[in-house]
């Protein structure tokens, strides 16, 4: 039953950070061990345990998959104590399982929380995404533009040349045309093997990450998580669902999707105030890696609230006993 208690993002934010931290700490011993499933399961178990300690009536809207595909943190699972506000939860207990298993950069634990009904119930299909950071006019770039047109528009807005723009793209064969178009402008490309939530977040802090724009096709659930991040950090993201067959369209209909061609903005993917937390696992330009020393594990978490625009970086030195 949905609880009518108000969504107090300030009171809930620290608890959400602890959820993210717990998942990261649980995966620490599996960094570089070559076992993706074990790393993911450890993070899932820890995240679920911590969520159930929170005084919320939570429903997982973006999770580990459909109920018949995932034993825990599946879409529709109820989490929390049941005594608290009704909330939507979007999560990825370990974004970058392969990155973790191979000890490669940019693996994160990621979770977002908003009032019940505030998040797009994105089906587990692909989404075409385009994202830029804060400070630009709305619709400066669009999914209707070619990659070349997007780069030229962004360069003009930044008052720089195309060669000064860096584009983040998932390294996939399906992106070969994007890569060719981008390089034809003289812009640089940073290819990433996994982790497109982190890829989108990089756009919001270009002075730190060196990334100006993200484009390409990735998972739709990750698109909602990325939208939650940019709702806090600023910036723009546009997403359009991609369907490869009728089964995927049926999955979308089940999730409540009616317009298959709709382009979603961040405010349509996340319609109300949201809290977002991410903790570094293997480290990268956004967050450092977990640090292990005798008796302690140290994490760094970014904790954000869209209501206030606050962005906090929290370092937690956790005794391992």
What is each stretch, according to the model?
Residues 144-296, 300-305:
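An extended, acidic
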Residues 116-154:
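Glycine-rich phosphate-binding loop plus the immediately following alpha-helix
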Residues 113-115, 119-125, 192, 239-244:
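Short, acidic/small-residue loops that bind anionic groups at enzyme active sites
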Residues 79-80, 109-112, 210-214:
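Short basic, glycine-rich beta-strand/loop surfaces that mediate nucleic-acid
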Residues 108-109, 129, 320-321:
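A short local loop/turn or secondary-structure capping micro-motif enriched for an aromatic residue
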Residues 84-95, 99-120:
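DPxDG-like acidic metal-binding loop motif
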Residues 10-13, 34, 98, 137-139, ...:
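A short glycine/serine-rich beta->alpha loop
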Residues 1-90, 149-152, 156, 197-198, ...:
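N-terminal subdomain of lithium-sensitive/metallo-dependent phosphomonoesterases centered on the IMPase/IPPase/PAP
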